[in-house]
């Protein structure tokens, strides 16, 4: 009976490990391409484990669609110069992303050009990275 319980726990632990690995997989992202578009911020989710940026863009057919961009968590973004209010709904921005392979609107965030021309990425420089206030 002890062996059965131990075996069950081991199987459950392995299942959780596979799920965690899949969560951090970039298999659905086309790492060979970047797209740059302009759009209007619909929502900015400043949250763990990932922040999200939702942007309304005009597609090539002239229809609007919402792009969902996965970003790093706030701790990384702060080191890259972000604040929780760096972008707000209604802001017109230009963004670069690595798109989904399946063609759905969205992907992995690379950077954004704000209305004032400031460019924000999602990773701080490796050496001498400054610490920024969050408010």
Report each predicted region and the residues it spans.
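Bacterial N-terminal signal peptides
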Residues: 7-19
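OB-fold/S1-family single-stranded nucleic acid-binding modules
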Residues: 100-123
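Short boundary/loop segments of OB/S1/cold-shock single-stranded nucleic-acid-binding domains
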Residues: 20-35
């Amino acid at each position: 009976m002890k062996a059965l319980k131990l075996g069950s726990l081991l199987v459950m632990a392995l299942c959780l490990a596979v799920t965690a690995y899949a969560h951090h997989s970039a298999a659905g992202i086309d790492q060979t391409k970047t797209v740059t578009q302009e759009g209007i911020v619909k929502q900015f989710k400043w949250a763990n484990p990932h922040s999200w940026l939702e942007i309304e863009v005009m597609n090539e057919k002239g229809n609007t669609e919402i792009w969902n961009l996965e970003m790093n968590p706030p701790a990384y973004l702060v080191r890259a110069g972000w604040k929780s209010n760096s972008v707000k709904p209604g802001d017109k921005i230009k963004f670069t992303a690595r798109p989904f392979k399946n063609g759905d609107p969205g992907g992995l965030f690379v950077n954004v050009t704000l209305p004032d021309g400031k460019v924000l990425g999602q990773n701080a420089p490796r050496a001498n990275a400054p610490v920024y206030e969050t408010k």
